[in-house]
Amino acid sequence: MHISELTHPNELKGLSIRELEEVSRQIREKHLQTVATSGGHLGPGLGVVELTVALYSTLDLDKDRVIWDVGHQAYPHKMLTGRYHDFHTLRQKDGVAGYLKRSESRFDHFGAGHASTSISAGLGMALARDAKGEDFKVVSIIGDGALTGGMALEAINHAGHLPHTRLMVILNDNEMSISPNVGAISRYLNKVRLSSPMQFLTDNLEEQIKHLPFVGDSLTPEMERVKEGMKRLVVPKVGAVIEELGFKYFGPIDGHSLQELIDTFKQAEKVPGPVFVHVSTTKGKGYDLAEKDQVGYHAQSPFNLSTGKAYPSSKPKPPSYSKVFAHTLTTLAKENPNIVGITAAMATGTGLDKLQAKLPKQYVDVGIAEQHAVTLAAGMACEGIRPVVAIYSTFLQRGYDQIIHDVCIQKLPVFFCLDRAGIVGADGPTHQGMYDIAYLRCIPNLVLMAPKDEAELQQMLVTGVNYTGGAIAMRYPRGNGIGVPLMEEGWEPLEIGKAEILRSGDDVLLLGYGSMVYPALQTAELLHEHGIEATVVNARFVKPLDTELILPLAERIGKVVTMEEGCLMGGFGSAVAEALMDNNVLVPLKRLGVPDILVDHATPEQSTVDLGLTPAQMAQNIMASLFKTETESVVAPGVS
C-alpha cells in the first residue's frame, strides 16, 4: 500500500514486514524530496524512519502517548499522523511546523524545540494517568545528544524510583546531536559500540562462521539470529548503568531492522515499570551524503538531491553575523590566550568550530548543558580567564538562574554572545530570540548591547573581551550582515553606554536598537518624503541606556519612537519609557516591536510584515499615531 492511503496510524498494525518496509521507503523518499525543496532538518528524521514505523505498529495511537525530544526528528511521525498530504508545506507560513505542536495535531502530545524535555514530560503524563486510574502507554523518545542534558538525567533519576510507573524511554543512539557529542555519557555509549565483543560481532563473526568446517555454510542463513544470541552472551552488562537506576533495559538493537524493533517494543511494553530501549541508528540513513557528513546534513537549506549542494544565491551575499563573530573572536583569541570560547553543543551554528579548529585549547564544548556552561564560565572568570559564551538567544533562557546567581551576584566578567536574537524564521516560536532584552536588562551587574551591523559587531566583541566591570552580553541576529566594510584588525572598543546620532531632524526622534537601526534610517527617508524630518539614534546599549544623549533630544524634539526586534514588554522601548518617566520627560512615545504574542514559523521577511516592522509599515504607523496623518500606503523606491 502507499502511505498516502493511510487514514490513521493504527492501520500500520495490519501490515506485513514487507509492507512496513515499503511504507518506510516512501517516508524516506518524501522526507528527502521535501527538505531538498523547502529546507529543514534532514539527518535526524531519516535516522528514525524504521523506529517510528515499528513503534507505531505496536501502539494504539488513539490513546497511547508518544513524546519526541526536541521534535526535529519527528518528520516521519508527522507523515504517519495525517500530515503526509500537507508535508510539502513544511516550515512555511501557515504550513506544517518543523517541530511538534499540540495545536497542530492531536497526535502531537507535547510540543518542543529545545532538548532533554521528553522524559520529564512523559513521566508527568504517566503519573497523571495513574492518578486518574486510566490505562495507556507513554513513550519518550530521546537522542543520545539530548541525553547529555541535565534535565533528562534528572527525569531518569526520578523515574527509576517509581518501580510501578509504566514509562518506556527509547534512546535513539546515532552518536550525534548537531555537532559530535561530548562528555562521559557519550563516551560510555561509544565504548559499548566499539568494545571488542561488539566489534567482533559486527565485523568478523559472519566471516569466521563461514570458515567453520562442515557447518559454516549451513549456519550462514541464520546469521542474524546467531549474532543476536552471542551478543547477549558477550555483552550482558551493556545496560548495567540504566538498570542500576531502576529501569529494565533492552538493547542495543538495530534501529533499521523492523522485525527486531517490533519484537523488542512488544516485549518492552509488557514491563510493568520503567523500561529503557537502546536503539542504534544511523543519522541520515538512506541518503549517502548525509550518512557520510552527519553534521553538515543535520539541517539544510534547499539543495540539489543529486549533488547535495545548496542552490547558489542569485547574487553574492555579505558574510553572516555568525561568521564575522567567529572570525573576529578567533583573531582576538590568537592575541590573547586567556580568551576561551564556550558552546553548549552548538559549535557549528555559533561558528565556534572555527575557533576549535585554529585554537583547540581555547575552546570548550559542554554538550547540551546550558546551565553548566554559564557556571563553568563563572568559574573560569574567577581565575582570570575571559570566557566567551556563544549561545543562541533562545537557549540562554535555560541558564537564567546561573546568570544571576553564579555570574552577576559575584560581578564576574563573563561575556555572553547571543546569536539568533530576534526573528529566526522557519524554526518558529520555540526558537525565536525575542525575550533576551527583557530577561537580561533587569539583572544588576550586566551590560547589554547590540550592533547595528557586522562592523559594529567586531567593535562590540573587542568591547566585551576587555570589559571587567561585571557581565556583558551582546545580541545579534540570524542571517547575513548589511554588507559594510570589515576590518581585519585594529578594532577599537566602544565606550560603555554611549549611543550615536546617525541623522538629524526636528520632528520626531527614532531610536533604533541593534538590527532595527538600518530600518530606522529607511523609515526616516520615507518620513522625509512626507515632510517629516527625523533624528535617528543608534542606541547600541539598552543597559546602561545613554540618557545623557536621549533625554535632551526627546525633550527638544517632543516625539519619540523606539524600534526593536524583540518583545515590547520589558524590552528596549520599555527601558526608554522608564527613563523618560523617571526624569519627568513627558512626551508622546510610540514603541515598535513584538507584541505579547508567539511568533509562528514563517520566513523572517513574512514575520517582519506580520509584525508591522517594515520601514513602510513603521512610517505609516508613526504618521498615523504621532502626526495624525491619514495615508493608505507609504512607498519609496528600493524600500519595503
From Swiss-Prot:
* Keywords (A to Z) from UniProt: Isoprene biosynthesis, Magnesium, Metal-binding, Thiamine biosynthesis, Thiamine pyrophosphate, Transferase
Gene Ontology MF terms = 1-deoxy-D-xylulose-5-phosphate synthase activity; magnesium ion binding; thiamine pyrophosphate binding
Pathway entry:
Metabolic intermediate biosynthesis; 1-deoxy-D-xylulose 5-phosphate biosynthesis; 1-deoxy-D-xylulose 5-phosphate from D-glyceraldehyde 3-phosphate and pyruvate: step 1/1
Q: Which residues hold Mg(2+)?
A: 144, 174
Question: Any one Gene Ontology biological process term?
Answer: 1-deoxy-D-xylulose 5-phosphate biosynthetic process
Write down the EC number: 2.2.1.7
Query: Catalysed reaction per UniProt?
Result: D-glyceraldehyde 3-phosphate + pyruvate + H(+) = 1-deoxy-D-xylulose 5-phosphate + CO2
Q: Does the keyword NAD apply?
A: no
- A GO cellular component annotation in the UniProt record: cytosol
Write the signal peptide boundaries. none
Task: Extract the InterPro entries matched here.
Answer: Dxylulose-5-P_synthase, THDP-binding, Transketo_C/PFOR_II, Transketolase-like_Pyr-bd, Transketolase_BS, Transketolase_C, Transketolase_CS
Q: Which cofactor does it need?
A: Mg(2+); thiamine diphosphate
Q: How many and how are cofactors bound here?
A: Binds 1 Mg(2+) ion per subunit.
The family assignment reads: Belongs to the transketolase family. DXPS subfamily.
List the NCBIfam families hit by this protein, alphabetically. Answer: dxs, PRK05444.2-2
Output the PANTHER family linked to this UniProt entry.
1-D-DEOXYXYLULOSE 5-PHOSPHATE SYNTHASE-RELATED, 1-DEOXY-D-XYLULOSE-5-PHOSPHATE SYNTHASE, CHLOROPLASTIC
Assembly behavior: Homodimer.
What is this protein for, i.e. what is its function?
Catalyzes the acyloin condensation reaction between C atoms 2 and 3 of pyruvate and glyceraldehyde 3-phosphate to yield 1-deoxy-D-xylulose-5-phosphate (DXP).
Identify this protein by name: 1-deoxy-D-xylulose-5-phosphate synthase
Q: Which organism is it from?
A: Synechocystis sp. (strain ATCC 27184 / PCC 6803 / Kazusa)
Gene behind the chain: dxs
